[in-house]
């Protein structure tokens, strides 16, 4: 049987090779095949299609052409491109000869490049485009490209195509325990806990077809080609890509289980007997992301291995394995040719009411169609799942004796069309909302007749259309999940309100607020449903008739496990993160001021690299940083504190820019002056000058910056196009834009904050203090004019002072906002309904006499400190140098994106690490341009009084507009600021040099 199967496969391969045709377009046509479009023009094409809604969806594209798939296979070598550009200029790419075992010439394309290939097509029909590529080192994120055909975007899904990387855990050694189970040799700390493994990239040559990055299309993306020469353009979005060749072909479709099983039976396949292969899920061979590594689950004794005391690496997946396209792969051996069953021990207690889906492949291909979308329903406990049909009959898998792989990939499955339809509905609902508020405003008078029906004659038709689409989505959802779920409740609420508004459109004035809430809830429904988490404990590949034992945990066993956990919680100090150093070893104590996720990651990095490299042990404790100063003064503080926020506990809070912790501790002799270390000057070259300003005073440096954030401008591309507005470059442009927005009942979003005031102050040439920081400089003409300008936006232009701008940006009420750049990460995760409709740019600036635009902004961030009570200052300094280094900050950024996704992206102050984070190339360009203008806000004794009084003056002016004068209010407050500065300088016996103007 085995020989016959291998012979059949060999014949198929020879036939496939025989049909292959290496295509070389005639030289005379190659130059003509190039499109001539620049990368910027391609980017504009994507934007125009996306924001105008003109881009065709793949299903519509496929339905509009004859469903014919030619058997021909066309291949173009990577080196045979017809055009290459880099950074918008003609260039020559780098070449790789016989790279990593692949014979021939490969071409390296950068993330800021475009490359074009020409195909000579003889027969019309649909073709699948695939690439043989190698994921060369980059920023450790998925490779992204836009794909164009003959200079056009055939359909929306090709605007962003991802090519994945391959990862593996850095622990590969294993052993067989006393129970005969193969386990990995994880590192352990002194408490017996397994250390979290790291992930390293394991690149290899990959042939990949094109898939929808959002997962709404679950099949391969195809191109319809007519006879003649066609040009395929690959436009870089993120990460470099090494291309060996491109291929146009059509693979044999995957048959259903019964058809495949009949073919196996006809070939003589038989059941194997007596074999059980057990695979611990945490022993994964490869994954698609550094987010996927062994996890520790102590919730139940059902997992293996289990312990109520130690934290053991015993599962994989969970919340980190939820995003479309993520996959995990395992290797296994079977001793005999024949049929096997496959079972999993899994838990899906994350998504209630619907199932999560996986595409299951063996040796790189799905054996039959049912595994292209296999569902795992909700279960609160660990369970045994045998891969079976809908009637519960276990599938049989034919396997040759020897080594195999099994891969499970997140897909949206049967929910994909529903989610896509609801996404379209949300887009329409938001458009309707913007149309209505142009007539009524965001807070309409219920007793006024706005004549909505007359002013918006197309509204009824729009409401009816979106209602029908939403009703269809609800019906399809119920067909999938039945009536035993509440997942449709949000959609039904939205549909019912649409029924009410179709009947009487004037009701918008009464229900506009609830309509907005319901639209937001519908958008959030998308975020919830596209999350597809699943946790695995182990897998079995076993002969039919063999028994696999998965212990069922009863009530008493579960109760005893919880009692043991409770007992150990009184014995083990859970404020200690990971390894607790031995009493007689050299160690420093580290306090961390953020969350447990961060603390666990930091501790694992310390154990993996810092302690082995330096011999310095680190006791890590997770504490509330509000206690740091008191604990230090009481002699109970740490040696080192990292991720220290502002002394009011809110780094980056709305009311504060800068971080005053370092200087406040420094003037009280609570922290070490880092300039005493001989290599301090070399270390601070890692940071921008602006990040250091807030940490020093009178030549001393009391800390190192960890994070640095600053404002950026966010704008809705679709709405600006709709209104005919350009992205504002100056504040004069902003005022013009605000006029247009006001006419359409929209606003410019900018909450009052020190970041906004500092931005205006610095752009106008002002300063907070004189040169030595002993006097306020807010009484200068520049500062007074800046304060006037600051107040005018909230008095003359009536900007909102309270409502959060991020949700109003999402609904379109505020299509242009100024916000901290970290909002980018939140929008990427929480606002899929406006994906592709927004972008970022440097903040508006002030035009100078020479015509240049000053875009200065202030910044804030977290700080690292060495406490003066330490007995190990040199060891502490070694730790800070390690912690703020390029590689460590880069790895920390990757690790934090592992459990939290893009929302966990770290705004590191290390400039090299910042540029290695997985930003799109265009967004990174915008951030780096703004970075050029970032300034630090100096911190001085008594400096907390500056913003407090500026803020008080602001609210006096903006609430008492008839009588309060910006100049007088600010001048009065400057007197109070100077009094506090003088008081603090006297308190700490500081001497002013009397120098002016900084």
Say what each PLM segment does.
Residues 34-540:
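Extracytoplasmic
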Residues 123, 336, 831-904, 932-939, ...:
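Extracytoplasmic/periplasmic substrate-recognition and gating elements
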Residues 338, 418-660, 968-998:
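Conserved N-terminal structural module of periplasmic/extracytoplasmic solute-binding proteins
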Residues 567-584, 649-712, 735, 837-844, ...:
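Hinge/lid segment of periplasmic solute-binding proteins
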Residues 608-687, 718, 722-726, 815-816, ...:
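Extracytoplasmic "Venus flytrap"/periplasmic binding protein-like
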Residues 693, 697-706, 711, 732-785, ...:
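Extracytoplasmic/periplasmic solute-binding protein
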Residues 775-802:
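Glycine-centered hinge/linker elements that transmit conformational signals in sensory
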Residues 843-845, 894-956, 986-998:
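Long, aromatic- and glycine/proline-rich binding clefts that accommodate carbohydrate-like moieties
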């Amino acid at each position: 049987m085995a020989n016959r199967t291998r012979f059949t496969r060999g014949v198929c391969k020879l036939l496939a090779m025989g049909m292959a045709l290496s295509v070389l377009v005639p030289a005379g046509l190659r130059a003509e095949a190039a499109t001539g479009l620049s990368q910027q023009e391609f980017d504009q094409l994507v934007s125009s299609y996306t924001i105008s809604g003109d881009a065709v969806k793949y299903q519509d594209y496929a339905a509009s052409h004859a469903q014919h798939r030619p058997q021909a296979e066309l291949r173009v070598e990577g080196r045979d491109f017809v055009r290459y550009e880099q950074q918008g200029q003609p260039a020559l790419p780098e070449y790789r000869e016989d790279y990593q075992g692949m014979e021939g010439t490969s071409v390296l394309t950068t993330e800021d490049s475009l490359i074009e290939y020409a195909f000579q097509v003889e027969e019309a029909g649909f073709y699948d485009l695939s690439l043989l590529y190698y994921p060369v080192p980059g920023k450790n994120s998925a490779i992204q490209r836009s794909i164009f055909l003959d200079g056009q975007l055939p359909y929306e899904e090709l605007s962003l195509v991802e090519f994945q990387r391959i990862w593996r855990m850095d622990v590969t050694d294993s052993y067989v325990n006393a129970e005969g189970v193969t386990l990995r040799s994880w590192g352990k700390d002194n408490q017996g806990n397994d250390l979290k493994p790291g992930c390293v990239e394991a690149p290899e040559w990959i042939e990949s077809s094109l898939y929808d990055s959002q997962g709404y299309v679950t099949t391969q993306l195809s191109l319809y080609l007519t006879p003649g020469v066609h040009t395929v353009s690959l436009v870089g979005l993120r990460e470099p890509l090494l291309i060996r060749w491109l291929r146009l072909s059509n693979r044999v479709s995957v048959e259903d289980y019964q058809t495949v099983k009949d073919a196996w039976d006809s070939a003589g396949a038989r059941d194997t007997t007596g074999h059980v292969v057990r695979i611990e899920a945490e022993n994964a061979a490869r994954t698609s992301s550094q987010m996927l590594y062994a996890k520790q689950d102590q919730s139940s004794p059902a997992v293996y291995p289990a312990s109520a005391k130690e934290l053991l690496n015993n599962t994989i997946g969970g919340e980190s394995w939820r995003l479309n396209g993520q996959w995990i792969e395992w290797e296994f051996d079977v001793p005999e040719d024949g049929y096997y069953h496959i079972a999993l021990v899994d838990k899906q207690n994350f998504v209630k009411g619907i199932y999560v889906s996986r595409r299951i492949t063996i040796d790189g291909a799905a054996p039959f169609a049912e595994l292209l979308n296999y569902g795992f329903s909700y279960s609160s406990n660990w369970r045994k799942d045998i891969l079976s049909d809908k009637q519960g009959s276990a599938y049989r898998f034919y396997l040759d004796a020897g080594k195999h792989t099994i891969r499970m990939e997140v897909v949206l499955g049967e929910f994909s069309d529903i989610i896509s339809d609801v996404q379209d509905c949300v887009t329409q609902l938001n458009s309707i909302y913007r149309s209505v508020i142009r007539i009524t405003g965001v807070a309409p008078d219920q007793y006024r007749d706005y004549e909505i029906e007359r002013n918006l004659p197309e509204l009824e038709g729009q409401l009816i259309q979106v209602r029908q689409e939403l009703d269809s989505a609800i019906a399809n959802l119920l067909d999938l999940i039945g009536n035993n779920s509440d997942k449709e409740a949000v959609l039904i609420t939205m549909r019912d309100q649409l029924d009410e508004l179709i009947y009487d459109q004037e009701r918008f004035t009464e229900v506009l607020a609830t309509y907005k809430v319901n639209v937001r809830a519908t958008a959030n429904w998308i975020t919830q449903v596209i999350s597809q988490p699943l946790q695995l404990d182990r897998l079995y590949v076993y002969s039919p008739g063999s028994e696999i034992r998965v212990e069922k945990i009863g009530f008493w066993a579960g109760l005893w496990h919880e009692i043991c956990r409770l007992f150990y919680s009184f014995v083990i100090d859970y404020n200690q993160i990971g390894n607790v150093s031995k009493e007689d070893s050299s160690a420093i104590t580290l306090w961390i001021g953020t969350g447990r996720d961060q603390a666990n990651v930091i501790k694992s990095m310390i154990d993996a690299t810092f302690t082995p490299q330096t011999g310095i042990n680190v006791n890590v404790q997770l504490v509330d940083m509000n206690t740091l100063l008191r604990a230090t003064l009481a002699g109970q503080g740490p040696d080192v504190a990292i991720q220290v926020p502002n002394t009011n506990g809110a780094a980056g809070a709305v009311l504060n820019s800068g971080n005053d912790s370092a200087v406040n501790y420094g003037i009280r002799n609570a922290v070490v002056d880092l300039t005493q270390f001989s290599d301090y000057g070399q270390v601070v070259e890692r940071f921008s000058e602006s990040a250091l300003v807030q940490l020093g005073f009178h030549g001393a440096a009391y800390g190192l910056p960890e994070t640095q954030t600053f404002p950026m401008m966010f704008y809705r591309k679709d709405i600006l196009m709709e209104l005919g507005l350009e992205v504002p470059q100056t504040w004069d442009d902003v005022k013009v834009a605000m006029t247009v927005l006001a006419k359409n009942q929209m606003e410019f979003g900018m909450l009052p904050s020190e970041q906004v005031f500092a931005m205006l102050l610095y752009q106008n040439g002002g300063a907070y203090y004189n040169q030595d920081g002993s006097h306020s400089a807010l009484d200068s003409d520049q500062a007074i004019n800046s304060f006037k300008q600051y107040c005018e936006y909230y008095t003359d232009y009536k900007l909102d002072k309270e409502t959060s701008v991020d949700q109003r940006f999402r609904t379109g009420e505020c299509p242009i906002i100024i916000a901290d750049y970290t909002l980018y990460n939140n929008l990427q995760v929480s606002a899929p309904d406006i994906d592709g409709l927004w972008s970022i740019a440097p903040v508006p600036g002030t035009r100078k006499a020479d015509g240049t635009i000053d875009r200065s902004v202030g910044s804030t961030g977290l700080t690292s400190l060495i406490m003066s009570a330490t007995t190990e200052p040199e060891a502490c300094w070694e730790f800070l140098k390690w912690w703020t280094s390029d590689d460590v900050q880069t790895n920390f950024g990757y690790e934090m994106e592992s459990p939290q996704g893009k929302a966990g992206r770290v705004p590191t102050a290390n400039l090299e690490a910042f540029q290695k984070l997985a930003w799109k190339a265009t967004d990174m360009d915008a951030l780096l341009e703004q970075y050029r203008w970032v300034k630090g806000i100096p911190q001085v004794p008594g400096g907390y009084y500056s913003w407090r009084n500026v803020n008080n003056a602001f609210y006096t002016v903006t609430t008492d507009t008839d009588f309060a004068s910006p100049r007088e209010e600010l001048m009065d407050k400057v007197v109070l600021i100077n009094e506090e500065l003088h008081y603090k300088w006297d308190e700490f016996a500081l001497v002013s040099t009397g120098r002016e103007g900084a």
